[in-house]
Every structure is written in C-alpha cells, then in structure tokens.
C-alpha cells in the first residue's frame, strides 16, 4: 500500500514507466551507442493528439505488432485537494471507483473485464488520479465504457468503503513497520517541511479513520472532471478510431464547477543538516536516506542532473555510491541514488540498507561521496558512459505499448514536444561535464543535507 517517493512528484509514473528516467545497469562502453532510427521512435508523424470540446486530451499511436491495446492517463484530482484532517481522501476515492457504480456492483464490473482478459486500475498521487488498463483491441470499447462508468458514476457502496478502509489501514500498519518506507517518508518530511509534498498521499491511520463514505462522494463530485484529463491509447487500433471511442464514452461528460488545484508554494531549502531517526523495534536492518531537494522535470538542470545521478549512484553496480558503500566497504545490503522530478520541486537522494551497527559509517561514506561529487563533478569518460547508456536504452523502454503510453503522457504532462524522443539522443549528448557539475552544486550542499534513518 505504501508508495515510492517518485510517485508523489511523478503521478503519471503510477500507470506507466517514465522513459526519461532510465535505469542504468548496462555494461560500460566508452563509445557512443548508435542512435536509434528516428522513424522507430514516437514523433509528430505518428503521434495523434486531439483535445475534445470538454477538455479531454487524447494521445494515440498505432502498433499492430500485437492484438492488444493499452490505455493510461490521469485526471486532475490528487492529494493537493486533501485537507490535513482527511489526508488520503484522494487515494481512498481513486481506489474506491472500481468497487461499484450506479449500474453495476464490484463483482459485475470485474466479471465483465475478466471475461475478456481485460484489466483496469486506479490510484492517486499529489496532483492527479491515475489509471491504467489493457485489453485486446476488439475490447477497447468495453474498456473505455468501464472507465467512463466508474469515473462518472461511482457508487461508493458503504460495505465496500469499509472493506477498502480496512485494507488501507492494514497497508499503513505494514508501512509503519517497513524501515525503507519510514525512512523515505521521514526524508520527505524534512526536505519538504513547509510544502504539500511533505504529506504521504495515502495518509495516516487517524486520517483514514476520519474519512466517511460521503467524503468520497463529495470529493468525486467536486474534483473529478474532464477538463485537464489526459488519455493515452497505444496498440492495435487506428488513432482516429480510438478518438471516436473516447468521444463516444466520455465526450458528453462535464463538470464546469471543478476548482483549480491550489498553487504550489515555493520550497524553502534547508539551512543546515537535519537528522531524524525513527525507531522500529525488532528489526535487523536500518534504512537511511540522505539528500536534498532537486529540480522539477522542466528545469534546465534536469537532464544534467539525471546524467550526473547515473554516475553517482545508478550506472553499472549502482555507480560511485554502490562501489564505495557496498562493493568496497561491504557496509550496505543495497546503496543507490535517485533523482525524482515532476511538476513541482523534486528530490535528489541516496538510499541504503545497512546493519544497524553500520549506520554511522555508511552515512559518513555517503556524505564523502556527495562532497566529492560537488567538488569534482564527473569525468568525461563517466559522462560518456552515462550518455551512451541513456541513448542505448531508450528504444528498449519503448518496445511495449505501456512504455509508449508512458512516453506520450510524459510528453503531454511536461510539454516536451511531440518530437522529444526524436531529439532525445542529441539532447543527452549535448550535456557537458561542467553542466553536470553546476547542477550538482546548485542542489547538493554537503553542509545542508536531510538525513532520515529508520531501524532498531
């Protein structure tokens, strides 16, 4: 039930893999990877984009190599609308959509989907409620009809609300005993202390207990609307036919009274190192997260920071962090860095799981690597390896319909342009070591770190 931190800043990634944040486990190569043929990547000539009169944006790309189709998307209704007293309401509402509608109960909805091997699921992040589904192309009308039915006329039957509440509370109880989850949540509370991103989207036990069935009905009535909704459809269907099906299922939906989401306040950066520890008795492992706030996805520093992060703690055996903390010193079960970027401010952090007796030693090594990263940046060879890996893995991330759907949502969410993936290799290769160094120095300040530890 607990959610990884990148979900908070990158709501779309709940339904699809962000191809701009590629994992790095390729064999090192000092040569540039060959550029994929531009015609094989999504681009303006094969991405269909249209906005319906009611505000729904559809992006579609045909792929007739398999008989299936994927839908992914989001509605502008996330936890930013939650009050502190009922935090988790957006997620509770999203997870309750499939529990019954005005026309059918839960069993009837799932029986209809499972009878043709289709699936549909929902969840919520800070900014959006997200959905993901798949079916055979011939069953796309059924999939879209189900989507329309549950987002427009959910019933939230009381029996199902209480069952869902019990499941959510169980998930939160598990989270409270998970050292990695608690370290991640505590890190957010430090870095985003005076910002909405400090709050976990799935709430706390007391806030979930406070939510009533009528709260779900009210949240849906107020905040679910077609304006700002985005749907990506990829697979064995012509884009024009996909558009006609979306128009048929959702074209007459409207909610003109939906309010805009509250604007994100500016983030106040840390002025000193803040260390916070969460005690969880009976554990044999401690998890720590050390880091800072990071760039938003549209910031100019994002791509240099992403390439630098690959060197710091992703590429090969988890980069410099993995080599120093795990391979050479043997202090960690795992150690890596991550760059989480979305609509608002992101985070740049190093995570490690260690023996509780090794927390101080591992923390010192990580802080030493941060200081070295900020002082010297990356070498030309390290950057070249990272660039080759980014470029070489892009086609792999776009081999599946789900990967392409994620790419289309990425383009729309962050206004990257329909030709973004055709330009991607050139953008990556244009980054210089100095740009990586400047990005590192902008965000990492070794004397101003957030350090979160959870364990015995």
Where are these regions (language model features)?
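Carbohydrate-associated surface elements
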Residues: 236
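Active-site SXXK
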Residues: 88-101
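Non-catalytic beta-strand/loop surface segments
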Residues: 5-9, 29-84, 99-141, 162, ...
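A common structural junction motif
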Residues: 149-156, 249-257, 368-377
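Intrinsic disorder/low-complexity segments
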Residues: 4, 15-16, 23, 30
């Amino acid at each position: 039930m607990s959610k990884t931190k990148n979900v908070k800043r990158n709501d779309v990634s709940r339904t699809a893999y962000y191809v701009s944040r590629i994992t790095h486990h390729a064999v090192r190569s000092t040569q540039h990877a060959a550029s994929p043929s531009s015609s094989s990547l999504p681009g303006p000539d094969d991405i269909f984009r249209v906005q319906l009169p009611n505000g729904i944006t559809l992006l579609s790309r045909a792929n007739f190599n398999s008989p299936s189709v994927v839908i992914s998307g989001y509605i502008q209704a996330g936890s930013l609308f939650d009050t502190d007293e009922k935090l988790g309401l957006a997620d509770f509402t999203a997870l309750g959509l499939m529990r019954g509608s005005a026309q059918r109960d839960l069993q009837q909805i799932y029986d209809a989907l499972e009878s043709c091997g289709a699936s549909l699921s929902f969840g919520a992040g800070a900014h959006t409620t997200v959905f993901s589904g798949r079916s055979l192309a011939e069953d796309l009308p059924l999939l879209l009809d189900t989507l329309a039915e549950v987002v427009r006329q959910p019933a939230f039957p009381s029996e199902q609300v209480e069952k869902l509440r019990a499941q959510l509370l169980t998930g939160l109880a598990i989270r409270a005993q998970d050292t990695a989850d608690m370290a991640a949540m505590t890190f957010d509370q430090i870095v985003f202390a005076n910002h909405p991103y400090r709050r976990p989207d799935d709430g706390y036990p007391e806030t979930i207990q406070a939510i009533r069935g009528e709260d779900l009905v009210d949240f849906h009535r107020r905040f679910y609307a077609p304006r700002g909704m985005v749907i990506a459809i990829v697979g064995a269907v012509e884009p024009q036919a996909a558009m006609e099906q979306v128009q048929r299922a959702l074209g007459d939906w409207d909610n003109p009274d939906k309010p805009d989401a509250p604007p994100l306040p500016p983030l106040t950066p840390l002025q000193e190192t803040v260390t916070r520890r969460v005690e969880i008795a009976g554990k044999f492992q401690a998890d720590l997260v050390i880091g800072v706030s990071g760039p938003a996805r549209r910031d100019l520093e994002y791509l240099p920071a992403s390439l630098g992060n690959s060197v710091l703690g992703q590429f090969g055996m988890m980069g410099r962090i993995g080599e120093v903390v795990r391979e050479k010193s043997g202090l960690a079960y795992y150690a890596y860095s991550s760059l989480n970027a979305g609509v608002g401010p992101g985070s740049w952090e190093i995570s490690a799981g260690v023996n509780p007796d090794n927390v101080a030693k591992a923390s010192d090594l990580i802080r030493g690597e941060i200081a070295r990263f900020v002082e010297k940046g990356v070498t030309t060879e390290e950057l070249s390896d990272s660039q080759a890996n980014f470029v070489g893995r892009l086609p792999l991330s776009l081999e599946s319909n789900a990967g392409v759907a994620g790419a289309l949502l990425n383009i729309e969410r962050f206004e990257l342009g329909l030709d973004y993936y055709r330009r991607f290799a050139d953008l990556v290769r244009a980054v210089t070591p100095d740009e990586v160094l400047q990005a590192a120095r902008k965000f990492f300040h070794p004397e101003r770190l957030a350090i979160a530890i959870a364990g015995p």
